[in-house]
Amino acid sequence: MAIYGIGTDVVQISRIAAVLERTGGRFAEKVLGPDELRVFHARRARSEARGIAFLATRFSAKEAFSKAIGLGMHWPMTWRALQTLNQRSGEPYVVASGELADWLAARGITARVTVSDERDYAVSFVVTETDAAPPPAPAPVSRTTS
């Protein structure tokens, strides 16, 4: 396996809370995939703060993943196409769907993710790996004078 890319993201949890309040909850529906949304609602029902922290970590993971694959938030990377779920052990993992899953499979890309949150911030780190041969290095830029 070779490293394809890395990405990290830090988000202020209060910013996520403000956007969630301003949008009446639509922000969570825009950003979270269906499995993430179920977990968000369950956690938020038990504790508003834990629900918002969950949303913040998932938002951060999507941002970090988009950086690790080198696309940013551009097709085929969309908010709902990538979900960060947890194993029974608590270990997070990512699941891609739709065109993003196809794009990743075509390049042999897999990912490892970690997320964490504290009172004020959520952070995530993603490493993407591939079995495929790396793309050729870009040609050096040369300057010509006339």
UniProtKB/Swiss-Prot annotation:
Primary subcellular site in the record, as a coarse category: cytoplasm
Alphabetical list of Pfam families matching this protein: ACPS
GO molecular function, one term: magnesium ion binding
Superkingdom: Bacteria
Keyword line: Cytoplasm, Fatty acid biosynthesis, Fatty acid metabolism, Lipid biosynthesis, Lipid metabolism, Magnesium, Metal-binding, Transferase
Catalytic activity: apo-[ACP] + CoA = holo-[ACP] + adenosine 3',5'-bisphosphate + H(+)
The UniProt record lists the keyword rRNA-binding: no
SUPFAM superfamilies for the chain: 4'-phosphopantetheinyl transferase
Any Gene Ontology biological process: fatty acid biosynthetic process
Cell compartment(s), UniProt: Cytoplasm
Binding locations of Mg(2+): 9, 63
GO CC annotations on file: cytoplasm
Record carries keyword Cytoplasm: yes
Cofactor list: Mg(2+)
This enzyme's EC code(s): 2.7.8.7
Stored Gene3D superfamilies: 4'-phosphopantetheinyl transferase domain
Function text: Transfers the 4'-phosphopantetheine moiety from coenzyme A to a Ser of acyl-carrier-protein.
HAMAP family: AcpS (MF_00101)
Entry similarity comment: Belongs to the P-Pant transferase superfamily. AcpS family.
Name by which UniProt lists this protein: Holo-[acyl-carrier-protein] synthase
Gene designation: acpS
